[in-house]
Curated annotation (Swiss-Prot):
A Pfam family: LysR_substrate
Function of the protein: Does not seem to be required for sbpA expression.
Keywords: DNA-binding, Transcription, Transcription regulation
HTH lysR-type domain location: 16-73
GO molecular-function term, one example from the UniProt record: DNA binding
One Gene Ontology CC term in the entry: cytosol
Entry similarity comment: Belongs to the LysR transcriptional regulatory family.
PANTHER family: HTH-TYPE TRANSCRIPTIONAL REGULATOR YBHD, NITROGEN ASSIMILATION TRANSCRIPTIONAL ACTIVATOR-RELATED
Protein name, as recorded: HTH-type transcriptional regulator GbpR
Keyword Magnesium applies: no
Length: 342
């Protein structure tokens, strides 16, 4: 047989099969055609014909035959090396498929508003990365209107927030999680803290405020709270939708802002801020997990969603077991509509 140059896709013309690759490896391990054929549950004549037909098609001899068995030559050694690589890759592909089907690998993109990011998403991601180390997780913190649009576009698999009024809620599946308790925060040592008593809206109205843009849920809640106490909304307002910027500004001057209590409780022990003692507790309407109804989630996304839904169920059960406030003045809920909710 005369060697020749192998063209692109030579393996198609040679009709190279998976069985050929298995035979190369078996011959390398056994160096005997009979034993190699037996390991593949083939007859020796069938194995001999399979090898001979391929050598004829390739135009090169791969194995030297002798009385004691067979030995791969230089060409055969090359084919054995690549056969092992291909078979190993196929085995790994099967293992990865199993992991993907089980939700152990793949990727998931999660969106969330700030409060559940701290008290729900972070603990769940910690568990997911421990139990599914090959699962790639991306998390983004945004306002609810941005999250709803990104889930609708398929940029995110699911999100935790509130479905804005201008969004068609029928497109989404939604699981309510919890209402979001709010609080006012300022820097440690703020002059208002020297009053030594729970503060009212009247005490806070003249402060400099760091608030979300007009129309946002938290901004609307603060304004409604002030009006309910017969006080005009804050006038000296610096607008910022970024909790990081709000926190940095509060730490540097005598401004006041509004945070989810869960978030404030994370930052206050660090000295970044302190919770303002207010004379009543107040919150905003519940947030939940939402995802598109008609778009199937990947196995990895289903794994993450199931973990978050389980964690939210636990959170709701604990909330129901807690003692309820004695009157409506203890916790006020603002259910006013807002076009741009945070």
């Amino acid at each position: 047989m005369t060697p020749h140059r192998f063209p692109a896709n030579w393996f198609l013309k040679a009709r190279l099969k998976l069985r050929h690759l298995q035979l190369f490896v078996a011959l390398d391990e056994h160096r005997n055609l009979h034993r190699a054929a037996a390991s593949l549950t083939m007859s020796q004549p069938a194995a001999s014909k399979l090898l001979g037909d391929l050598e004829e098609s390739l135009g090169v001899t791969l194995f030297e035959r002798h009385g004691r068995g067979v030995e791969p030559n230089w060409y055969g050694g090359l084919m054995i090396r690549h056969a092992r690589t291909i078979l190993s890759g196929l085995q790994e592909a099967g293992e990865e498929l199993n992991d993907l089907l089980a939700g152990h690998s793949g990727s998931v993109s999660i969106g969330t508003v700030m409060a559940p990011a701290v008290e729900l998403v972070v603990p769940v991601i910690t568990t997911l990365t421990r139990d599914h180390p090959d699962l790639k997780i991306a998390v983004a913190v945004e306002t609810s209107d941005v999250l709803a649009e990104r889930v609708r576009q398929g940029v995110m698999d699911f999100a935790i927030g509130r479905l804005p009024d201008h969004v068609d809620a029928s497109c989404f599946d939604y699981q309510e999680i919890s209402s979001e308790e709010l609080c006012f925060v300022c820097r440690d040592g703020h002059p208002l803290l020297r009053l030594g008593r729970p503060l009212t809206a009247a005490d806070l109205v003249d402060a400099t405020w760091i608030l979300q843009p007009l129309g946002s849920l938290l901004r609307s809640r603060v304004e409604a709270l002030f009006r309910a106490e017969g006080v005009p909304p804050p006038r000296k307002v610096i607008e910022s939708a970024s909790p990081v910027i709000s926190l940095a500004m509060v730490a540097e001057n005598d401004s006041v802002t509004v945070f989810a209590r869960a978030l404030a409780q994370v930052f206050s022990p660090t000295g970044s801020c302190t919770i303002v003692p207010f004379h009543k507790r107040f919150s905003v309407e519940p947030y939940g997990i939402f995802w598109l109804k008609d778009r199937p989630l990947s196995p990895g996304a289903r794994t993450a969603l199931a973990a978050l839904r389980a964690a939210s169920d636990t959170k709701m059960r604990r909330a129901l077991e807690m003692p309820q406030p004695s009157s409506s003045s203890d916790i006020e809920m603002c259910m006013d509509s807002a076009n741009n909710r945070i």
